[in-house]
């Protein structure tokens, strides 16, 4: 056994020494952008339209309205025509498909907002003559026979055109624009599909914005509405200004918050996004397409003001210079519409904003992008850009599909490390299987596990992949406010050692829930054990999902294949070796976890521009090391919520979780169990600093290298694995990915083994007391397989859900499913007057209270555990006043302990 451990540890320690030295960070080499032309859309001649409504219904792309100059060009004084026609392209992948006119809007419209929604496409506002704004809102959708229908939705409170808008988070947003020719700062939103009216939001700060760009995207904590660019028209003697800044609307605080100016990384000059369109990409990026050149545009729109001033100067002074200046301006104005397209310098790059690091970059360049007033919509895995103008007055008929993909490069050395690790874990399970043993060996390791190994195993089990991916991702996106929750693990260790451990050790139970039957009744035991099994299967699914995200991010292998592969390897090695294989596997994995984390911290700080000094400057400027939020808001992660929730949730885990309690029983004596609990608490406090430091390091690294982010990253929790793959030397990256797998396997294997213990002891042995050890062991191994497969199935389902933070999701599941268990053990040990029936009623009411809190209030999920425990104890105490039970409690509660 020692030789096997030495081999595994030596392999992972020596490997970094032979890994290649990392090259300096380069620009993003993993995202590729492809452009292709699809069927052109021509309306009334050979040209397309500008400012149309664009959306999708199913796989079809719809284009409605728009405007152009059909007969006489704008340069020759032509009149702009507005349209009501609706065109459809049924399949963008079929080169033979053409656009077909299928219906009409109730009125000609352009310069409004269009968004694709689950039931169709919504068209908001606009103008039909360039003067009068519309407040009407239309829903385009199909009936069962696929016929297009146009229904009217609640009208805007204020008629608008030339505004921006987006759909996300269950709301349609619009902001800015003109209201019958007057620029406004107004913003509105309407819940869709159940909204009955538009909600007026606070006006956005600063000057008005005409033709801004907008998108809905996640920031660190929630879905937000982003509004950037646009221009403020001439206001009296104040010149027009093309904006180079932007804001996002924070719905929780009901306020607009400024974002960084549009200065792409590596450049010094700000851009504008007037006439551009935005669309979300991945979990935290917004891609902006098209738009005008700031200098050219401001010069053109301010020409009337410049002419007015020049005429005043020429009339007042009658100098030759003043007259020549006036004539020069007139000539410039007359020539403005006659320049070639290149002269206008419309934006021909993808301008990309990252909501977490608050940075701008540009990516790719194509003449197909150099348009203003286009329409853009996501169709499948591509963005479709429709028409627009290539210069003032000239409409393009082009329709372009843009596809941005991420191509990971994992490399043979990384694969070698990862495969070697997985093989090593299977061999570890095989080693313990050959040693044989009875059911006591399978469930409790024969009581021969050293205290330090049990302590490391508890640590690896409780934190695991959530520590390695979710905590760094949380610190990267927010700050260190979750860290005090880990400190509460050490705080909770002391009451666990004093009040709980003696009961589990002296009663010599295999399943923690045996105690509940002795203290209360069989029904309580069975219900608690069943709820624990449900929670463990859910936890298995979540923890299985995390590394699968990592493997998908770094290798490109399909997420579902990764989930199945990860589940099968873990089930095999856990089923073979029992808890002893699990614990010694956790020891190996614990070393990899800690060593890999410390290496990553150093590498991230070294890779940040400015090194350690640059790292410190950024985290201080952006408040990334904030530990405490002293607000009394019970809806967010304030200090009080973190401490109260952390104490409750960790008390639940360390007093009612069979996975942890089983470790208490694997040591040779109670003193060893005490030391293992304290070791876990100390590791949780000090080692976890490294994982939060990783999050801060990821933030500083990518803030100084924003072009190296994956612009299509679908899950924020994959930021650390992406860094490993994209920045670390070959071999080192494989080692840290192996650490994520180590974290996962430690948790899942412990969960599987604990589920097998709970089912075999609490159900099988309970109803088959005469069953032999061999039969019990067979049932346990079969339970391992069944529970692992169930966890795998739920993980596959989870892959289809939109989860912003897996850490938050785990804490919510913990509170919902486990709070009642913690309440039962509290009642059993500290409330001798509560009998079995009162405890059962309290347990059920505690679980109900948590679910009611979840669905009827905005209370932070971190408080669910506290609410469940507190409710169950209060109800249990009240019921005990009316339900009296006589039962010997000798050795079963603290007052009657032996």
Language-model regions: role of each:
Residues 1-4, 833:
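Positively charged n-region of N-terminal signal peptides that target proteins for export
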Residues 4-5, 22-23, 211-213, 259-260, ...:
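Residue-level detector of intrinsically disordered/flexible regions characterized by low predicted structural confidence
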Residues 13-14, 275, 341, 891:
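Intrinsically disordered, low-complexity serine/threonine-rich segments
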Residues 21-409:
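Kelch-like beta-propeller repeat domains
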């Amino acid at each position: 056994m020692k030789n096997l451990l030495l081999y595994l540890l030596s392999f992972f320690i020596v490997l970094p020494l032979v890994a290649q030295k990392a090259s300096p960070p380069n620009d993003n080499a993993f995202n590729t952008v492809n452009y292709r032309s699809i069927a052109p859309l021509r309306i009334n001649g050979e040209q397309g339209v500008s400012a149309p409504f664009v959306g999708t219904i199913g796989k079809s792309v719809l284009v409605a309205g728009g405007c152009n100059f059909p007969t006489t060009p704008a340069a020759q004084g032509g009149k702009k025509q507005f349209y009501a026609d609706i065109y459809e392209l049924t399949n963008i992948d079929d080169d033979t498909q053409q656009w077909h006119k299928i219906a009409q809007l109730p009125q000609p419209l352009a310069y409004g907002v269009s968004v694709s929604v689950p039931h169709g496409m919504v068209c908001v506002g606009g103008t039909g003559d360039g003067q009068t704004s519309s407040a009407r809102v239309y829903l385009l959708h199909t009936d069962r026979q696929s016929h297009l229908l146009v229904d009217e939705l609640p009208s805007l409170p204020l008629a608008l055109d030339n505004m921006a808008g987006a759909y996300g988070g269950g709301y349609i947003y619009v902001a800015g624009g003109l209201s019958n020719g007057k620029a406004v700062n107004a913003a509105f939103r309407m819940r869709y599909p159940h909204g009955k009216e538009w909600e007026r939001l606070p006006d956005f700060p600063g000057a008005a914005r005409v033709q801004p760009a907008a998108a809905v995207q996640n920031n660190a904590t929630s879905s937000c509405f982003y509004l950037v660019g646009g221009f403020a028209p001439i206001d009296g003697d104040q010149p027009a200004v093309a904006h180079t800044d932007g804001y996002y609307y924070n719905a929780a605080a009901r306020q607009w918050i400024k974002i960084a100016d549009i200065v792409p990384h590596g450049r010094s000059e700000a851009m504008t996004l007037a006439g551009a369109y935005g669309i979300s990409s991945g979990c935290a990026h917004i891609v902006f397409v098209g738009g005008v050149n700031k200098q050219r545009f401001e010069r053109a729109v301010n020409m009337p003001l410049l002419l007015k001033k020049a005429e005043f100067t020429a009339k007042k002074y009658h100098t030759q210079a003043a007259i020549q200046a006036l004539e020069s301006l007139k000539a410039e104005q007359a020539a403005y519409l006659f320049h070639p397209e290149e002269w206008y310098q419309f934006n021909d790059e993808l301008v990309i904003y990252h909501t977490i690091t608050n940075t701008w970059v540009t990516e790719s360049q194509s003449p197909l992008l150099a348009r203003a007033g286009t329409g853009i919509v996501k169709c499948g895995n591509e963005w479709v850009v429709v028409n627009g103008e290539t210069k003032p007055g000239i409409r393009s008929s082009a329709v372009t599909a843009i596809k941005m993909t991420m191509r990971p490069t994992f490399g043979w050395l990384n694969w070698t490390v990862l495969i070697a690790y997985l093989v090593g874990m299977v061999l570890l399970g095989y080693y313990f299987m050959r040693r044989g043993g009875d059911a006591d060996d399978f469930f409790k390791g024969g009581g021969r596990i050293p205290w330090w190994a049990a302590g490391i195993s508890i640590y690896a089990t409780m934190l695991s992949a959530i520590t390695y991916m979710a905590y760094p991702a949380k610190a990267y996106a927010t700050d260190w406010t979750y860290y005090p929750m880990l400190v509460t693990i050490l705080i909770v260790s002391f009451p666990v050692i004093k009040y709980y451990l003696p009961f589990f050790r002296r009663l010599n139970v295999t399943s923690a829930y045996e105690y509940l039957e002795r203290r209360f009744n069989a029904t309580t035991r069975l219900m608690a054990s069943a709820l624990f099994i449900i929670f463990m299967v859910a936890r298995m699914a979540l923890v299985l999902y995390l590394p699968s995200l990592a493997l998908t991010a770094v290798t490109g292998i399909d997420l579902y294949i990764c989930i199945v592969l990860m589940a099968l390897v873990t089930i095999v090695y856990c089923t073979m070796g029992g808890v002893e294989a699990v614990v010694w596997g956790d020891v190996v994995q614990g070393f990899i976890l800690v060593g890999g984390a410390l290496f990553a911290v150093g590498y991230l700080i070294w890779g940040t521009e400015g090194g350690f000094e640059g790292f410190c400057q950024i985290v201080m400027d952006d408040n990334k090391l904030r530990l405490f939020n002293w607000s009394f808001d019970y809806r967010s992660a304030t200090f009080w919520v973190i401490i109260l929730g952390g104490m409750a949730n960790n008390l639940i885990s360390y007093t009612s979780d069979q996975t942890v309690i089983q470790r208490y029983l694997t040591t040779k004596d109670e003193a060893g169990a005490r030391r293992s609990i304290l070791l876990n608490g100390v590791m949780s406090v000090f080692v976890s600093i490294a994982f939060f430091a990783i999050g801060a390091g990821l933030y500083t690294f990518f803030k100084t290298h924003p072009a190296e982010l994956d612009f299509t990253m679908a899950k924020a929790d994959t930021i650390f694995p992406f860094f490993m793959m994209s920045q670390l030397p070959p071999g080192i990256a494989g080692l840290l990915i192996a650490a994520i797998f180590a974290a996962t396997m430690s948790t899942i294997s412990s969960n599987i083994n604990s589920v097998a213990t709970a089912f075999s002891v609490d159900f099988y042995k309970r109803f088959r007391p005469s069953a032999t050890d061999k039969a019990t062991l067979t049932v346990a191994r079969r339970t391992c397989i069944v529970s692992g497969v169930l966890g795998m199935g739920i993980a596959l389902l989870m892959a289809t859900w939109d989860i912003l933070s897996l850490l938050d999701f785990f804490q919510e599941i913990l509170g919902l499913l486990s709070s009642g268990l913690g309440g039962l053990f509290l009642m059993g040990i500290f409330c001798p007057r509560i009998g079995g029936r009162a405890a059962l009623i309290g347990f059920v009411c505690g679980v109900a209270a948590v679910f009611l809190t979840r669905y009827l209030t905005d209370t932070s999920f971190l408080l669910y555990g506290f609410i469940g425990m507190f409710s169950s104890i209060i109800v249990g105490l009240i019921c005990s006043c009316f339900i009296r039970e006589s039962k010997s409690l000798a050795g079963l509660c603290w007052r009657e302990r032996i």
